[in-house]
């Protein structure tokens, strides 16, 4: 599927990310997704689509991950502390210089924590006092995992699959923002440049899938959970 097709099909977002048309011009009423879309269109930079920045929290990701894992494994976790740690972890993961936490151990640890958290949430009644905090923990862990995957798939070693992060960025765009009248052509010029690069990288990805499928599979396998999570979310959005 081309980036243009993806933009057309992702026509709505979950209630928590949906703004009203009457408040579209009010920056205070914009959904997080709309804010990110505006930033992405204005800059034409991949990091803007995910809210990634070089000024993100400088906290040590690996240290936070270990602390969070120990707290989650307690027989009776302190859920407010757990939620705060997960929030700090997600913030730390948003930095665009995250190479130090891309080791296999960190990936497996985080994926294991997400599975544990999702399982625990599934067995927690919605009426339980800990439910909302646990749901928040799960969302922040998945957010950290997304940024972990983006950091790795945009690295030189993953050049053959560089089109994947571009596609993940494009499916998160808010079509209502894209449909607005251009406020300034320079913004759209930058975004158009990104689209051109994304089309080229997606074409290269398609070619690599045909001619180097085993290598591509090895590169993508560690990030299958991220890709499936994002794809599943978009399918839920469009009603499948």
Curated annotation (Swiss-Prot):
<dbReference type="Pfam" id="PF15457">
    <property type="entry name" value="HopW1-1"/>
</dbReference>
<comment type="similarity">
    <text>Belongs to the HopW family.</text>
</comment>
<keyword id="KW-0614">Plasmid</keyword>
<feature type="compositionally biased region" description="Low complexity">
    <location>
        <begin position="9"/>
        <end position="23"/>
    </location>
</feature>
<dbReference type="InterPro" id="IPR029378">
    <property type="entry name" value="T3SS_HopW1-1/HolPsyAE"/>
</dbReference>
<protein>
    <recommendedName>
        <fullName>Putative truncated effector protein hopW1-2</fullName>
    </recommendedName>
</protein>
<feature type="region of interest" description="Disordered">
    <location>
        <begin position="1"/>
        <end position="32"/>
    </location>
</feature>
């Amino acid at each position: 599927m081309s980036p243009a097709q993806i933009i057309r099909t992702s026509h709505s977002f979950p209630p928590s990310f949906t703004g009203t048309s009457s408040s579209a011009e009010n920056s205070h009423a914009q959904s997080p997704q709309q804010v990110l879309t505006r930033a992405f269109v204005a800059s034409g930079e991949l990091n803007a689509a995910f809210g990634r920045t070089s000024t993100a929290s400088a906290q040590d990701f690996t240290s936070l991950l270990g602390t969070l894992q120990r707290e989650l494994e307690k027989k009776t976790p302190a859920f407010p502390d757990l939620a705060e740690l997960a929030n700090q972890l997600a913030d730390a993961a948003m930095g665009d210089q995250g190479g130090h936490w891309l080791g296999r151990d960190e990936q497996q640890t985080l994926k294991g924590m997400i599975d544990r958290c999702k399982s625990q949430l599934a067995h927690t009644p919605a009426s339980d006092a800990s439910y909302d905090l646990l749901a928040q923990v799960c969302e922040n862990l998945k957010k950290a995992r997304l940024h972990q995957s983006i950091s790795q798939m945009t690295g030189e070693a993953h050049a053959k699959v560089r089109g994947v992060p571009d596609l993940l960025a494009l499916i998160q765009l808010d079509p209502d923002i894209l449909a607005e009248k251009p406020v300034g052509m320079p913004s759209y010029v930058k975004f158009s440049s990104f689209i051109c690069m994304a089309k080229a990288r997606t074409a290269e990805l398609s070619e690599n899938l045909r001619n180097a499928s085993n290598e591509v599979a090895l590169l993508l396998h560690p990030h299958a959970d991220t890709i499936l999570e994002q794809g599943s979310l978009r399918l839920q959005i469009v009603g499948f």
